[in-house]
């Protein structure tokens, strides 16, 4: 597996729906609190002890995508996280927490927030899903409101042609 070494930081508020307005040095707990999902909010300290303040290991074991803290708060910070949750569900075979489903079934509130995200970033997430399993991705998108698919595919979607070998 991959090991990621980063400086711990504490984020300020997110007024643009993408990046924090300010960043300052922080503790490991500050850094883990700003993560999107519990399975991404674990660390190992210098004595090889697992730091898991949001029960990410349990969610990993149960194959569940759950937000650190409030899903609404995490997705307001960066709306692309909604699509990341969908991608992890599709590519990793994880279920989604009820709070995330509530957001997916509230498209009139959440779909407009995708407008702050570049179409390129949206397409990157969708391409990763489609590359993993096209049918499952399309089935998933069909299962949620058409408002989502309209927003996701508003600029169209270019896929590389594929050829089945016989």
Stretches found by the model and what they are:
Residues 1-166:
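Catalytic cores of the polymerase beta-like nucleotidyltransferase superfamily
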């Amino acid at each position: 597996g991959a090991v990621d070494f980063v400086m711990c930081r504490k984020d300020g508020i997110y007024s643009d729906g993408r990046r924090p307005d300010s960043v300052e040095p922080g503790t490991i707990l500050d850094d883990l609190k700003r993560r999107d999902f519990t399975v991404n909010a674990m660390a190992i300290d210098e004595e090889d002890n697992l730091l898991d303040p949001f029960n990410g290991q349990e969610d990993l074991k149960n194959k569940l995508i759950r937000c650190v803290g409030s899903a609404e708060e995490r997705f307001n910070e960066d709306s692309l996280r909604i699509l990341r949750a969908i991608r992890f569900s599709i590519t990793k075979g994880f279920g989604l927490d009820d709070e995330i489903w509530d957001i997916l079934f509230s498209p009139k509130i959440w779909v407009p927030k995708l407008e702050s995200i570049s179409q390129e970033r949206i397409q990157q997430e969708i391409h990763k899903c489609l590359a993993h399993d096209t049918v499952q991705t399309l089935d998933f998108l069909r299962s949620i409101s058409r408002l989502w698919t309209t927003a996701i595919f508003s600029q169209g979607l270019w896929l590389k042609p594929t050829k089945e070998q016989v």
